[in-house]
Structure formats: structure tokens, C-alpha cells
Amino acid sequence: MSTENKIAIVTGATSGIGFEVAKRLGQDGFTVVLNGIEDAEGAKKAAELQAEDISAEYVGFDVTNEDAVNSNIQAIGEKYSKIDVLVNNAGGLGGRQRFEEMTTDFYRKVMALNLDSTFFASRAAIPYLKKGDHPTIINYTSNAGWNAGGPGAGIYGTSKAGVHAITRALAKDLAEYNIRVNAVSPGTIDTPFHAQIKSTKPEVFASWKNNIMLGRLGQPQEVANVVSFLASADASFITAETIQIGGGQALGI
């Protein structure tokens, strides 16, 4: 499958794993549309890719804002006449609150960041994915979606379990259009977020690392490698699956 003239959208792509995914897909030959909410950084990252002869642009919008998602993904789809790959990378912990003290606003914020965003972007992209070449959606869940998260991260785990479920539901719903839908589940990856945990809560970080069977943190490029595979023709018979990328961490938690 040639990736010439193929279009990939990567949400939350201005740093960390998202940027490495956008870079790898660009190296694979995709035109990549980077999304984020920090416009100056987004423009800078798109320029970095362009300097490496990657066809890239930045489109800023908040993935938790339904109207913004609809209008911007529609604009991207109309500009390129299709979408081939949607990577729902945007998401995050959002903070920590135990259920007894949890505010409704916090609950809604975390669910919106992880689950609503996946739904909004996927729904908006479907009409253009139908026009794509071997189209696919790639979502992001987490070990927390399997083990319900650590202290204060229960609603994060709940939201990521929802992403796991919506991945399968979308795969079932879109199979008739040959749109594949899968998810990746990164473990503890060497990103600024985990570097912050290491410096502020070293005991928590140590417990995470001790549960990684391969004895080291994953690298963002290793997640990007799997996303690249799922976006390729080599994965043409894979749908409704979640791939763990955690060095065996899911077995240790």
C-alpha cells in the first residue's frame, strides 16, 4: 500500500508521544495534520517536520469542544477530500481525586479529555474516512483502563476503559465500510509527564518501573512504531484490538 497522497490526523501532537507518532507517519509518507491547543508550539513542530521534508501542517483546536472538532475536521476533510488515518492521541490524567471527594466538574473534565474527545473526533472523521484508502482509526487507552488506575486516578482508569470499549464498538459499526479501528495501550513511557512523576513522587515512579518486566521505560518512538504498523497495509486484517506497549508492565500491576 503506497502512502503517497495519504492523510493522517494526529490529535495532541505538539509534544511527547503524539509528536513522535506524527513524525513517524510523516516519514512513512503521509501528509500529517498535527493538532493541539498551543498554537505557537504547534506551528513550531509542524515547521520541524517540514524541515525534514515531511508534508505537515498544524491545525489548532480543543478536542473536548464538540463544535470545534466538527468544524476543523470537516475543514481538513474537505481540503484533502478524504482522511486516511485518525490517531486519537490527545488525552491525559487531568489530576487526581478520590471518588468520595470528586467534584462533578473534575469527573466531566477527565471523561471529556479521554473519552468524549475520542468520540467527537471519530464521529467527525467518519464521512471522510469512508473516502480514504484503507482507512483506520487508532485510539489510546492505558494500563489504567485494565487495572482501574492508581490512588486518585480511578476516573482516569474509567475513561480509558471507555476508550477500550468504544474502540471495539466503532470497529463493529464501521467494518462494513472497511474502516479498521484499533487502540494502543502505552505503559510507562519516557515523556515529560513521567519525568515529572519521577521528580515529584519518586516512590510512585519506582513502583511503576519495578513492574516493567523488561526493566526500563518505553520510548515514544516505540509507541510510534506500533501506530505506524497499525496504519499500514501490514495490519489490514487487524481490527477491534488493543495492543499493549508496556514491556510487560500490565502483568505486573
Language model features: what each stretch is:
Residues 138-162, 167-176, 188-189:
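Catalytic loop of short-chain dehydrogenase/reductase
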Residues 14-15, 38:
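Conserved glycine-rich cofactor-binding loop
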Residues 28-44:
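Conserved glycine-rich Rossmann-like NAD(P)H-binding loop of the short-chain dehydrogenase/reductase
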Residues 5-6, 55-58, 82-83, 129-143, ...:
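Active-site loop of short-chain dehydrogenase/reductase
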